[in-house]
Amino acid sequence: MDLHNIREDYSKRELSEGDCADNPIEQFERWLDEAVRAEVNEPTAVNVAAVDGRGRPNSRMVLLKEVNSEGFVFFTNYHSRKGRSLDAHPFAAMTFFWPELERQVRVEGRVERLAEKLSDEYFESRPYQSRLGAWASAQSEVIPNKAVLVAKAAAVGLKHPLHVPRPPHWGGYIVIPDLLEFWQGRPSRLHDRIQYRLLDGGWIRERLSP
């Protein structure tokens, strides 16, 4: 398959240092708000990359559930491949891509498990069927067929017809950033790249060559 001629020329917007907030979390919130208002498809979808105990990289898409002054929060099965990788090497890289705005954001940082109380609170807010699924799915494990999964979910529903407690193997992670990069597509591949680096407790903002 020849893909050489598939390309886009970006020209919608530009990003100058003067446009950027001093704090990268504030800058991210600005861009996320713009993505939501522009009705970008799945604006909170983010690729999370991690490295397992053998040094082998792996990545997947998850949904960002919170961003605050501490970092970026998402939830998953702790026994999944990504969960095992993050526990073995507690660092991650995240990439948001908003093609409608010709933008992407990269985040790198240390990863910690979220406090159990916070994981409990979010789990309680999930739809009933999603809570059943968290118990039924041994995420990333091989199963003989889909019927096994459906049967397990049904069994959990019979056991917990009203209230489904959070499984101990399911909860949140927070990525505590030490680097963020904001990328704005520009004509002739002369893209705008503004990077924030954490140094001695403060953020250094700098422009990168595209």
Swiss-Prot record:
Keyword Flavoprotein (UniProt): yes
UniProt-listed InterPro entries: Pyridox_Oxase, Pyridox_Oxase_CS, Pyridox_Oxase_N, Pyridoxamine_oxidase_dimer_C, Split_barrel_FMN-bd
Binding site for FMN: 60-65, 75-76, 81-82, 104, 139-140, 183, 193
Keywords: Flavoprotein, FMN, Oxidoreductase, Pyridoxine biosynthesis
Binding site for substrate: 7-10, 65, 122, 126, 130, 189-191
Pathway involvement of the protein, from the record: Cofactor metabolism; pyridoxal 5'-phosphate salvage; pyridoxal 5'-phosphate from pyridoxamine 5'-phosphate: step 1/1; Cofactor metabolism; pyridoxal 5'-phosphate salvage; pyridoxal 5'-phosphate from pyridoxine 5'-phosphate: step 1/1
Enzyme kind, highest EC tier: oxidoreductase
Gene3D superfamilies: Electron Transport, Fmn-binding Protein, Chain A
Cofactor(s) needed: FMN
UniProt catalytic activity: pyridoxamine 5'-phosphate + O2 + H2O = pyridoxal 5'-phosphate + H2O2 + NH4(+); pyridoxine 5'-phosphate + O2 = pyridoxal 5'-phosphate + H2O2
Pfam family of the protein (one): PNP_phzG_C
Alphabetized GO MF terms: FMN binding; pyridoxamine phosphate oxidase activity
Enzyme Commission number(s) from the entry: 1.4.3.5
UniProt-listed GO biological process terms: pyridoxine biosynthetic process
Coiled coil region boundaries: none
Domain of life: Bacteria
Function according to Swiss-Prot or TrEMBL: Catalyzes the oxidation of either pyridoxine 5'-phosphate (PNP) or pyridoxamine 5'-phosphate (PMP) into pyridoxal 5'-phosphate (PLP).
Assembly notes: Homodimer.
Family the entry assigns: Belongs to the pyridoxamine 5'-phosphate oxidase family.
UniProt-recorded name of the protein: Pyridoxine/pyridoxamine 5'-phosphate oxidase
Gene responsible for this protein: pdxH
